[in-house]
Amino acid sequence: MAQASRSGSLPPLVIVPPLRAQPGGTGEEQWERSRTGGLRWEVHCWPSGTSGGTPWWPTPADVSEDYEADAAAWRRGPAGGGPIPPALQRLRAVLLRLHREREQLLQARDCAYHLQSAVRLMKTLSPGSPSGGPSPLPQWCRDLQLHPSQGAVLRIGPGETLEPLLLARPIGLAAQCLEAVIEMQLRALGREPASPGLSSQLAELLFALPAYHTLQRKALSHVPGAARPFPTSRVLRLLTGERGCQVASRLDEALQGSALRDQLRRRCQEEGDLLPGLLGLVGGVAGSASCGLGLGGAGALWSQYWTLLWAACAQSLDLNLGPWRDPRATAQQLSQALGQASLPQECEKELASLCHRLLHQSLIWSWDQGFCQALGSALGGQSSLPTSSGTAELLQQLFPPLLDALREPRLRRIFCQPADPAPVALGLCTLQTTLLWFLGRAQQYLAAWDPASFLLLIQKDLPPLLHEAEALYSLASEESLALEVEQQLGLEIQKLTAQIQLLPEESLSVFSQECHKQAMQGFKLYMPRGRYWRLRLCPEPPSAPSEYAGLVVRTVLEPVLQGLQGLPPQAQAPALGQALTAIVGAWLDHILTHGIRFSLQGALQLKQDFGVVRELLEEEQWSLSPDLRQTLLMLSIFQQLDGALLCLLQQPLPKSQVHRRPPCCCACQEVQTTKLPSSCLNSLESLEPPLQPGTSPAQTGQLQSTLGGRGPSPEGYLVGNQQAWLALRQHQRPRWHLPFFSCLGTSPES
């Protein structure tokens, strides 16, 4: 019986009758039950690793056949069909116990062996470089695979096996350690220089992958995520990542010298020599069925390797450059080397992409720096530059790199990457900042009444900014903006550009209103009223303007002339025209608003005061061209001025000096009417005092010759408020009197 037990042909445990089925057992049987009862929790509570109770290791065919035959013979019982003697039953129980203990010991030995292998593997694995000897990875993988001893297949119950989950966790941890070691060894091999020894070391490592994958799949069936496989793409990515870093370090050194082109050729030659053997090894492993890796042919591997290699090189080189190197200069140097050296297509593509990324990075950095400087200058107050605003120059410098980026289609595609701001968005930000800065600075200058700085802003700084905004508008409105977000930003740029285009006209309008306001305040404070304008007529006309006229006109107009110095006449004319119109208009409005009445002497004095405007324009310090002065004096406001003076100079004679006239229209001479010369712009000096009683005939002839020149009728210079100006005369006709009905009245005041 002992020999039968050693042979392993024992009956199966699954059909053993329970010992508790014999209530009348002996003491020895009860002792046996007490000894074996401690193991029942293992027998009935042990989970099965696979469905149907099949163990997850291969079972020999002969063992299975003997096992089934013995089980069938055991079920048949004795040949005679009689009952089993009690002594034989006791021996049978002892034999079953011994058989069970033997199976448990064999199972414990196998578990201890695999646990010892897993613990030893986790302790001895290190991230060091691979040694020159044979790789221990295949042996480690075989040690961790479960191969139970012969006869140790223990089926405890239907669908149950003994040890899968006992070893699942340590083997899963060991598989993770193996994965880390393989990855580190692949990285270490990638850092090695190209040599024949590199291929042999890589071959040893790659041929160990099938055993690792077998272990990984079995461990994965019990512990999901225990370890990852090493497909061809991962192997190539690990190798090219390290080799790309090595190539990038060589190129970084060459960028600081002058041998970049030669270094590129040398790197490509070395990788080209190494590539056939390396791809042959990777392709051989990929084609093996046990590895489970499938990839295309050698051409696909070749292209994939070159692409991954130079992509890793470009990424590493970009990191090596850092923010302390000029990306634009590096991109130009690298582009020049690519154009001179004959390189693989994948190399040129990846390095050209790196050049564009560097240019994009340079543009973004320069825009950021310039934008921050512009914001700092805008917050710093007025610029110290005498001819231009420093903030305007900084804002203007933001546009050229953005325009270059929009003009370059390939660079524009790189800008459209989600991680980087697009040039269209930066252009919109620049336009918004420019518009807000201009409006704020214009309001600041006008509030402080600094017309020189204001005119410098709109005549010197605004035109270049407007030109850049229009260029950005033309590029942003093209159909090449394919992205929807770019099209939306382009619409916003169009709206802002339209607002900026209206700034010159709107600014001059606001400037004219401010000039009118300042002049009105000055006339309100300094222009006299009352008797000053109602004096009797003197024999000599006034020869000097009043003090208030020079004070108010020079206070408002001189800063304007100072701000326009150095500008071309085309830029001076609009601002001066607005300023003159505002000042003279405020002068006339002040007279009408306060109802100042003028005698003939007062009207002549007012005419002399108006001459201050022309005298100021003719001063040499302002360097105004004669054509510009002539253009300014052609303004319609001076025609209104001449009309107002004409109304005031049409003074009727006082009542005491009026005598009865014959009823004839041609005899009406009591009203002195002046005529303007041919040019209304020179009428400020052509309106002379009319003839009054007591003047000499010589003075009368001279006055008539001065005022008798050809020109338009006085009605041509009178505006809609003609009656208001006529009402300001000291001596007036009746409101209903008309010149052609003068013969109907006996006197002007009747």
UniProtKB/Swiss-Prot annotation:
Keywords: Coiled coil. The keyword Membrane does not apply. Residues 1-29, 687-714 are annotated as: Disordered. The keyword Coiled coil applies. Residues 87-110 form a coiled coil. Disulfide bonds: none annotated. This is Coiled-coil domain-containing protein 142. It comes from Homo sapiens (Human).
